[in-house]
Amino acid sequence: MKQLFVILTLLVTVTLNAQELTVEQHLEDFDIVVRQVEENYSGFTAKVDSLNHLAYINFKAELRGQVGTGAKRGRDVGAEYTAFFADYHLFITDGGFNCTQEYMPKHKQIPHYWDSIEYHPSKLACKVTDRTFLIRFPSCSGDPTIDWVKESIKSYLQSGCDNLIIDIRGNNGGQDTYYKPYLELLYDHMGTTEGVEFYNSEANREACIQVAESRGNPKWLTSLIKRLKESENDTFVIWDEETSSIEYDSISSKPIKAAIIIDRLVSSSAEQMLLELKATSHRTTIYGQDNTLGCIDFSNTRPAAQLPNCKAMLYIPMTRSVRIAKGISIDETGIKPDVRIKLPLPKNLTDIIDEWTVWVAHDLEKE
């Protein structure tokens, strides 16, 4: 009931704001969104180029005109504006609600699996068959914990199974730290991962300084800040290295074969996990029906501005992958599976072994 009360309070607050704000206040909110994005968004120069610059200018003017006539609210038009960039790391929230998502272009829409099946991927570590073990890893945000991740690996190694399935359906990322033990387990050859560039705006630098101070000024952050200040005339500054090696001291004898199961909701850090596995593990095959979401090119999102009148919050990514300067984008298509699963959606995806998992296990066990 307490949660319901909070939601209702937020809904009432939004409604009151919509009734009380003047056109001038809505325009002020919208103009702040545009200014913040144009000045600080790490994807702006890649998303707005000579081919679509005029279309962008016209779209922006059209949206502002809709606010000026009172036809739309500043928050809603700001959300529609941010959706123009088709980047799930660039968004506006209001009371915990992602306002940008509903305006995303069709090719970036998220499928509502939960409308047709019981969809609540939950952590799980168990045998599927005598030869294949399942670890369901639905988040890189702390649930499951690092300790659980390590225990799941221990359970697998003690199971006697040759094959391993890691099911990451529904995993929309968090922190890379959580998947690293799985990467080490599946690693079988040295590989590389591409670094990121920091969009060196004054506001982004200041945000970086504030984060460093809040964390006790760790060396890796103070080193970045020093380079940002020394390179104030450079639009982008390499965070660490353009490419980094992925190498572990040993190679685990198990699993003999490994599978990762994905769906459209896999994004951000979970996509980075896939890229690093593709770079370092010949024994791992990616299975799925849909490509991943594509939410990895622009990252390190920060709260950029609370809009002064409607009180919604704008979030902006500060970094971009070095792939972007090479004309390579993951966000455009997402990451495709190596093997397409041509089955109906499972009846439910919770903390049980579902039909897709059984099918993948049988595929791994083919001689």
Where are these regions (language model features)?
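Loop/turn-rich, solvent-exposed surfaces of beta-rich toroidal or solenoidal domains
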Residues: 228-235
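Bacterial Sec-dependent N-terminal signal peptides
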Residues: 1-20
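A recognition module on extended beta-rich or small alphabeta surfaces enriched in W/G with H and D/E
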Residues: 322-342
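Flexible, low-complexity junctional segments that flank or bridge functional domains
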Residues: 18-224, 242-243, 254-259, 272, ...
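Short glycine/proline-centered loop/turn elements that form peptide/ligand docking sites
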Residues: 289
